[in-house]
C-alpha cells in the first residue's frame, strides 16, 4: 500500500443529493459548486426564459422541463479535499437511474422542502440508502418562505424515514421574518440577508446565543429562539459521529439554497464528517480502497453527452488503487484489455481528460457498445463487483415506427438506450414489436424525445397488455427448454440477453409459478450476472 494512494483516498468525499421533485435539489447542487469556487455564477433552475440553464441539467428534455433526468457528475476541490458530487434525477419516474447512482456513493445529502415535509420519492430513495447503511446529511430548504413547524419536520423525518435527527443549526423565524440560523455546536448566529449572489464570508456572524447585540437586532425572535433551543436540546439527539457513519442518525441543517444561505455549513459537514471511500464487495472478496492495484465498476451509461459527437460514456466508480491515463486495464466480462487513453472527468457537460484518479472518483470511459452497466474493470484480477440491480419494470409499451425504412435506427437506438438503463427493452420470442419496460411514465417520453433528437426516428408507443416482468432461470436445462416451449407467447429476451417472462396479470403469474416449481422467477437481476 503506498502512502500516496492512502493520502488521496482520505481526501476524497463522494456523495449524491437526493430529494423529491422540486425540493430545490438542482439549485442546491449549483450553490455547492458556487461556494466551492467551481463555477462563477449559478444558473438557477426556474429562470428558463433567461436562457441560464443549471450546470447539471444538460439534456434537451431537461432544459425544456426544468427537471434533472440524467444524473450528472461534478468534481471540485474544497478545503484540501476532492469532492465528487452526483446529482440524481429528482423526478419520481427515474428511480432506477437514481438507485444505480446511489450504489456509487459513500454518503448522501437529503434535501427536504420545509413547506411540504417528507414526500414519496424521498421515502423511496432513503430506503435505497438504507440497504447499504449510507450516512445521510439533511438540509431543510426554503426557509425564506412560509414553512412548517421545525420540530414537526424533525418528528416527521424520524417517524416516516426511521432515522434519528440531530439538529446542528436551528432556524430563527421563517418567510418574511426569517432572520438566520443558530449553529448549536459552534454557539454562533448567522444572519440572513436575501439575495442569491452572496458568498459565505458576506453573511454576518454574531458569537453566542446570550450576546446582548441580539436583543437590539430582533428582541422577539431571540427570546423565541432561546425557548426553542432549550426544547430542542431536551427533546432531540446530540450529534454522534459513529451513529451518523452507521446510517442511524442524520445531522440536520436549515436554510435557503436559492439565497446561498446554509450552504457552507453543509459543505463543511460533508468534509468533516462524511466518510472517505469505503471497501467494496466483489464476488470473490472485499476490495479495500487503498490497495495498490486499480479496480472499479460501471454504474451508468450515458448516450450522446455531446450532441456534436454520437458518443456514449460509461461512468466508472474507482474502487481501489490509482488510475493513470494510458494504463492498460481489463474489461472483465468480455476478458479484453483496453488502453485507457481518452478517459474523462466531469463538470456536468464540460469534460476534461483525466491524468489520474483514485478510489471514490468517477471517470468516464468512451464506450463503443461493449460496456454494460455493472461491468467491472481491474488490472487483471477477476473481480466482479456486486450490488447493482435491475428492477422488474412496472409499465410496458409496445413500440413501432412511422417510417418502416428506419427500423435499423430504431433497433440501434433502443439497444443503446437499453444498455444505458434509460428504459428496459424486451424482444418477444414471438411477434415482431419490441416491448419497452419502465418504472415511470416519463421514461417513455424521454425515450420518444431521444429517439427523435439523437437517432432521427419517430416512434409510436402503444399500450401493451403486460402486468409485470420476471427474469427466469433454471439449473435443469431440459426443464427450462420445456418451459420455453410451453410459454413461448409470454417470453422475451432483454438487452442483456436474459430470458424474461412477461405476465399479462397477477393471476397468470401466480399460476405459472405454481405450474413450474423448478423455474426461478426473479424480481431483480444483478447487472454483472447472467441468469
Swiss-Prot record:
Keyword annotations from UniProtKB, A to Z: Cytoplasm, GTP-binding, Nucleotide-binding, Protein biosynthesis
SUPFAM superfamilies: EF-G C-terminal domain-like, P-loop containing nucleoside triphosphate hydrolases, Translation proteins
Gene3D superfamilies: P-loop containing nucleotide triphosphate hydrolases, Peptide chain release factor 3, domain III
Chief location: cytoplasm
Residues covered by the tr-type G domain: 10-278
InterPro entries the UniProt entry points to: EF-G-like_DII, EFG_III/V, G_TR_CS, P-loop_NTPase, PrfC, RF3_C, RF3_dom_3_sf, RF3_GTP-bd
Location relative to the cell: Cytoplasm
Molecular functions (GO terms): GTP binding; GTPase activity; translation release factor activity, codon nonspecific; translation release factor activity, codon specific
Positions with a binding annotation for GTP: 19-26, 87-91, 141-144
Domain of life: Bacteria
Record-level GO cellular component terms: cytosol
GO biological process: regulation of translational termination; translational termination
One Pfam family here: EF-G_D2
Function comment: Increases the formation of ribosomal termination complexes and stimulates activities of RF-1 and RF-2. It binds guanine nucleotides and has strong preference for UGA stop codons. It may interact directly with the ribosome. The stimulation of RF-1 and RF-2 is significantly reduced by GTP and GDP, but not by GMP.
Family: Belongs to the TRAFAC class translation factor GTPase superfamily. Classic translation factor GTPase family. PrfC subfamily.
Protein name: Peptide chain release factor 3
Source organism (scientific name): Neisseria meningitidis serogroup B (strain ATCC BAA-335 / MC58)
Higher taxonomy: Bacteria, Pseudomonadati, Pseudomonadota, Betaproteobacteria, Neisseriales
Amino acid at each position: 500500500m503506498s502512502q500516496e494512494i492512502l493520502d488521496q483516498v482520505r481526501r476524497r468525499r463522494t456523495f449524491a443529493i437526493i430529494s423529491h421533485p422540486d425540493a430545490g435539489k438542482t439549485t442546491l447542487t449549483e450553490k455547492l459548486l458556487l461556494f466551492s469556487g467551481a463555477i462563477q455564477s449559478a444558473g438557477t433552475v426556474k429562470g428558463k426564459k433567461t436562457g441560464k440553464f443549471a450546470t447539471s441539467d444538460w439534456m434537451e428534455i431537461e432544459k425544456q422541463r426544468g427537471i434533472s433526468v440524467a444524473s450528472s457528475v461534478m468534481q471540485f476541490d474544497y478545503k484540501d479535499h476532492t469532492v465528487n458530487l452526483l446529482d440524481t434525477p429528482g423526478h419520481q419516474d427515474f428511480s432506477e437511474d437514481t438507485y444505480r447512482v446511489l450504489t456509487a456513493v459513500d454518503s448522501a445529502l437529503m434535501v427536504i422542502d420545509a413547506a411540504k415535509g417528507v414526500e414519496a420519492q424521498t421515502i423511496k430513495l432513503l430506503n435505497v440508502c438504507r440497504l447499504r447503511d449510507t450516512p445521510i446529511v439533511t438540509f431543510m430548504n426554503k426557509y425564506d418562505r412560509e414553512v412548517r413547524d421545525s420540530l414537526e419536520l424533525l418528528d416527521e423525518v424520524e417517524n416516516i424515514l426511521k432515522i434519528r435527527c440531530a439538529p446542528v443549526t436551528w432556524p430563527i423565524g421563517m418567510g418574511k421574518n426569517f432572520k438566520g440560523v443558530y449553529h448549536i455546536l459552534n454557539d454562533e448566529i448567522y444572519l440572513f440577508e436575501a439575495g442569491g449572489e452572496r458568498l459565505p464570508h458576506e453573511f454576518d456572524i454574531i458569537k453566542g446565543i446570550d450576546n446582548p447585540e441580539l436583543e437590539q437586532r430582533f428582541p422577539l425572535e431571540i427570546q423565541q429562539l432561546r425557548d426553542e433551543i432549550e426544547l430542542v436540546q431536551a427533546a432531540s439527539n446530540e450529534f454522534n459521529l459513529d451513529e451518523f457513519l452507521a446510517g442511524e442518525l442524520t445531522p440536520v441543517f436549515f436554510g435557503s439554497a436559492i439565497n446561498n444561505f446554509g450552504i457552507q455549513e453543509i459543505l463543511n459537514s460533508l468534509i468533516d464528517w462524511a466518510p472517505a471511500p469505503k471497501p467494496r464487495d466483489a464476488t470473490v472478496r472485499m476490495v479495500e480502497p487503498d490497495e495498490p492495484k486499480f479496480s472499479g465498476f460501471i454504474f451508468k451509461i450515458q448516450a450522446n453527452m455531446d450532441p456534436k459527437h454520437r458518443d456514449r460514456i460509461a461512468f466508472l466508480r474507482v474502487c481501489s488503487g490509482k488510475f493513470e491515463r494510458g494504463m492498460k486495464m481489463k474489461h472483465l466480462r468480455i476478458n479484453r484489455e483496453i488502453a485507457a487513453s481518452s478517459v474523462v472527468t466531469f463538470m456536468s457537460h464540460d469534460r476534461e481528460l483525466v491524468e489520474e484518479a483514485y478510489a471514490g472518483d468517477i471517470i468516464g470511459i468512451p464506450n463503443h457498445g461493449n460496456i454494460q452497466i455493472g461491468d467491472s474493470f481491474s488490472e487483471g484480477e477477476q473481480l466482479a463487483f456486486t450490488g447493482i440491480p435491475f428492477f422488474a419494470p412496472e409499465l410496458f409499451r409496445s413500440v413501432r415506427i412511422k417510417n418502416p425504412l428506419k427500423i435499423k435506427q430504431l433497433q440501434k437506438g433502443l439497444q443503446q438506450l437499453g444498455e444505458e438503463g434509460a428504459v428496459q427493452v424486451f424482444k418477444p420470442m414471438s411477434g415482431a414489436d419490441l416491448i419497452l419496460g419502465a418504472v415511470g411514465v416519463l421514461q417513455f417520453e424521454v425515450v420518444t424525445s431521444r429517439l427523435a433528437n439523437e437517432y432521427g426516428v419517430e416512434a409510436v408507443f402503444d399500450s401493451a397488455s403486460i402486468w409485470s416482468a420476471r427474469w427466469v432461470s433454471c439449473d435443469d436445462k431440459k426443464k427450462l427448454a420445456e418451459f420455453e416451449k410451453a410459454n413461448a407467447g409470454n417470453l422475451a429476451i432483454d438487452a442483456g440477453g436474459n430470458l424474461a417472462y412477461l405476465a399479462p396479470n397477477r393471476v397468470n403469474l401466480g399460476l405459472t409459478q405454481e405450474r413450474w416449481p423448478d423455474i426461478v422467477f426473479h424480481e431483480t437481476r444483478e447487472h454483472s450476472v447472467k441468469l
